[in-house]
Amino acid sequence: MTGQDQTIVHDVPVNVAQQPNPYPLFERIREHGVVQRVRLNPTLEVWMVTGYDEAVAALTDPRLSSSPVGVNGLEKEMAHQERTNVLMASMLVANGEDHTRLRNLVSKAFTFRRVEQMAPRVQAHTDAFIDAFATRGSADLVSEFALPLPMAVLSELIGIPAEGQPDFARLAVGLIMPPNTPERLAKGAQARAELTEFFLPLIAQRKADPKDDLLSALCAAQAEERISDRELTAMTILLTLAGHETTASLIANGVHALLRHPEQFAALRDDPSLLPGAIEELLRYEGPVSRGVARFTVDDYEIGGVTVPAGEMIIIGLAAANRDPARYDRADILDIARREVPQQLAFGHGVHFCLGAPLARAEARIAIGTLLRRFPDLRLADPDADLSRREGILRGMATLPVAFTPEG
């Protein structure tokens, strides 16, 4: 690629996260230039960044807004979203001082020290879920492990009582549906409304009787007027979305990738010291976010040799950037012993870097490490099966049937 070709609008389907291999599409787009015009649906064309250096630049540039409010052509839709989507009050779309204020309210829960303190509980949950199928010699690692494990950890962190966790898990699933049809828009709104109703009595309980959990800390901040009612609701829903599905996808995608690369599986099984680097490589190779994260231009914005007009949406392609051959040698090869310096971008970068990344890494490290230790002959139940992906905005496995020598 020697220049930017702006004569083509590339189609990036809404179900790109469910495609068996979306990476050739991203590479074809990148061949025309690292910043390209793409079509997300018949009525929405945006800009997409596929280069690593350009993605880092965009993720750290304060001139780009995380909020679509005020963007040309989106005013009507954004006015509706402001009224109906409580996530518009979350730090996900906040900028500047509001983002810092909201992030600081929960940052202590995700420090490395706090995560280290949580590690024994993560290990205990991991062992308990594995114990439930260890003597069978087979399991679906999505429904029996990758999904319930982060839900159990998140429930403890937030302060969800055991009796409420099944409902919590059921409601969380509705948050990941892509809003590409009226029906899914309605389901997403219903899921947010039901989750809001789910949290109301818990919030009342924590206000009356605080515990050592994140929900109590947020209620205390609300009492001090550091967070509004709507922001508190938005925070609980955002934590549910980010803390559950992202980690579940990381675990399932990671195990699937290792089982598809037996030499990498064997290397990691035989040398557990490779685990920290392996998690980073698995995030780079097959992260939970396929299409990317959105930013919005307030003024004309130059990136990668292209001037993007004011009032436009830019999709920063995290998965595409993580396989940029200009940044990574053998970018399409899984190599858990990779020694390259560039940080993978699966958790984003800059001030909006995923707050829960340390916990997600710890959960994945413990989960995958324990699986390999307890089941050294872990394998796909049917190596020739075309396994489907979970429907939603994230890239995750719908099912992952495995076999192994039963314990005991």
Model-predicted segments: where are they?
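Cytochrome P450
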Residues: 1-408
